[in-house]
Amino acid sequence: MFNCFFPDEYLDSTYVINFDDLYAQGYRGLLFDIDNTLVPHGAPADERACALFAHLKELGFKCCFLSNNQYERVSSFNDAIGVQFIENAHKPSTKNYIRAMELLGTDRSNTVFIGDQLFTDIYGCLLYTSDAADDLT
């Protein structure tokens, strides 16, 4: 019953993920939460985040921020990064996970979601990737 709140993998930081391996495994889309996933809550994009996204683009990943924050927060964070974004995403609703993948031209078989909150990020992603998700599209 509570499996929908457990991520497929747990790591201490986004910055320890081996994105080169993910790309080699065939993943092409990355969806990211922002606050407490990439930077502390409310912080601007820092050098580490900018370097990460430069590397991801170099690898060939398509990226999108999926955030429950308002436009001003997400847009200002993205100014230094330059990827697609969806603000006010209403996670855990699956609607904008689907929309983000449509923006990237990817699907659930080749997209990874990276977030920190169990009841919004993880739950929403697992709702979408469950077998029942086919009924939602």
Where are these regions (language model features)?
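Short, acidic/turn-prone active-site loops that include or flank metal/cofactor-
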Residues: 88-94
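Acidic, divalent-metal-coordinating active-site segment for phosphoryl/phosphodiester hydrolysis
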Residues: 117-127
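Short, structured coil segments at secondary-structure junctions
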Residues: 80-82
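Conserved Lys-Pro-Asp/Glu-containing loop-to-beta segment of HAD-superfamily phosphomonoesterases
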Residues: 94-119
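Single conserved hydrophobic/aromatic residue that forms the stacking wall/gate
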Residues: 128-137
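Short active-site oxyanion
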Residues: 60-64, 85, 109-111
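Substrate-recognition element of Asp-dependent hydrolases with the DxDx(T/V) motif
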Residues: 30-32, 37-45, 49-78
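Non-catalytic pre-domain segments flanking phosphatase-related domains
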Residues: 1-32
